[in-house]
Amino acid sequence: EQLIPKKTISEDKEALEVALRISAQLGWTQIQDAGSPFGDFQLLQQINKEGNLDIRIQMYLGMDGSGHAEDGNSYTSTERNPVDTFLDEGPYLDDEHMLSSRGIKLYADGAIGSRGAAFLDKYNDYDTDGFLIFKKETTMPILLKALRNGIQIQTHAIGDRGNRITLDWYEEAFKEIDSVNRLIEKPRWRIEHSQNIQPEDQVRFKDMDIIASMQPSHAIGDLHFAGKRL
């Protein structure tokens, strides 16, 4: 902060307003943002109340590995974790359906390029098997409360170990909170990227009705180094 001053709330709000205006000028009618800082959501609520939200926005609240809102970015004075408030209150949708937040994004592991994706075996070109970002002791309470209160979950997982552990924890949560005690009987949670999955885990997506949210662009983006890494 000695070299680059910390942004102010008004600067962040102005940046969002400019981005919204440009997006509307380009013809965008809706944006989905997966893994938003909680502070951005608060500012968009304010912009919406002022009547300046020109496009529909659906946001997923981003979280770090310790179960806190991503970046700890909150513009209200409160000691309570924003994630806890969101989990208790359930999905947010304004009266005009312009701004909504129906879910939380978790992160199981890193990426292949940085060798952070969590694999069952070590990388071919480095002595590591990647790492896990989330922790079970902070993640499971989130999954259980999300099932009770109708909150969608999407989890970033790229390595086969990251995907397997995510499936394991989803399955454990589904067993503990059965369909009778869920706000949404069939929540259809997602695993984002789902890039490397062992054959025995593939059928589990179908059995648990989990969406394998894959992006074809990653096949191209990882093309030049995936062969060496794996």
Regions found by a protein language model. Give the residues of each.
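Short, small-residue-rich loop/turn micro-motifs
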Residues: K105-A108, G116, Y170, F174, ...
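Divalent metal-binding segments
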Residues: E1-T85, R102, L106-G162, S179-L183, ...
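Glycine-rich phosphate/ribose-binding loops and adjacent secondary-structure elements
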Residues: G150, L167-D168, E172
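Acidic (Asp/Glu)-rich catalytic clusters
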Residues: I47-G51, E89-L99, K175, S179, ...
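Active-site-adjacent C-terminal substructures of enzyme catalytic domains
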Residues: N196-L230
